[in-house]
Swiss-Prot record:
The chain crosses the membrane at residues 99-119, 136-156, 170-190, 199-219, 224-244, 259-279, 283-303. It is found in: Golgi apparatus membrane. One of its GO terms (molecular function) is hydrolase activity, acting on ester bonds. Involved in the fatty acid remodeling steps of GPI-anchor maturation where the unsaturated acyl chain at sn-2 of inositol phosphate is replaced by a saturated stearoyl chain. May catalyze the first step of the fatty acid remodeling, by removing the unsaturated acyl chain at sn-2 of inositol phosphate, generating a lyso-GPI intermediate. The fatty acid remodeling steps is critical for the integration of GPI-APs into lipid rafts. It comes from Cricetulus griseus. This is GPI-specific phospholipase A2-like PGAP3. GO terms for cellular component: endoplasmic reticulum membrane; Golgi membrane. It comes from the Eukaryota. Residues 21-98, 157-169, 220-223, 280-282 are lumenal. One of its GO terms (biological process) is GPI anchor metabolic process.
Amino acid sequence: MAERTARLLLLTVTVGLAWGSQGDREPVYRDCVLRCEERNCSGDALKHFRSLQPIYMSLAGWTCRDDCKYECMWITVGLYLQEGHRVPQFHGKWPFSRFLFIQEPASAVASLLNGLASLVMLCRYRASVPASSPMYHTCMAFAWVSLNAWFWSTVFHTRDTDLTEKMDYFCASAVILHSIYLCCVRTVGLQHPSVARAFGATLLLMLLLHTSYLSLVRFDYSYNMMANVAIGLVNLAWWLAWCLRNHRRLPHTRKCVAVVLLLQGLSLLELLDFPPLFWVLDAHAIWHISTIPVHVLFFRFLEDDSLYLLKESEAKFKLD
């Protein structure tokens, strides 16, 4: 549904980390980066660096300065551990061991698997649900929006840049808003299509204004987090209220209830925020992995509900 919603509800207090963390504020780290850049990132030294850099690293956008930050991060971590201190974060993130050009291997793979699950369920939905089902096109659009979000999540965890960060955040917001629209169509729009169209246009305008402000005015992490928390609460509450009201008449709504409750429960994994195991697997990656079956379950609900609506519409047509 909106896998990131539950996580957003728990991360509000950590927004400040995006602006700086203990590790990157350390004089040892700053001095190390400065010396590394002076030594390696200009003139003949830079040419030498580029000649030795693997092609996949340069294609992924890894620069000499990025490599300096990466190497100095591990030097700083080593000093912390040597002195018996807790592993620090850098730029709002734990230190991760890079694999090839992938910055956060476990989260990137987990995002990719979520995307593949979305693709498989999209194909399954299209194969099992006729296009004449009242919710077919809305559900298909939601599947594509979800697939796009997981693509950018994979890219972001592969290579964290300003662009990939924004696309990850914006596409996550789009998924939540489209889930709200999906719920609106299911609960109101089938009886009042004009209401759903007007509501959908409003949500689209909200997304446009949200992304425009963050892109053109100021990327405010706190505002972005609070905005997503607000729409996430609306999304979860609306789906849960509708499911509980209709669970006796529509047994398949239990799958949707399970999705909402599981997402809330699994989001507690984020509270376990700990340095990555083997410098690869952190709580966020585990959370991403755990959402794969939940994602599949929600698409199963959409499939069951669409087939129910098709059967209901065909029965009404025969009566008419």
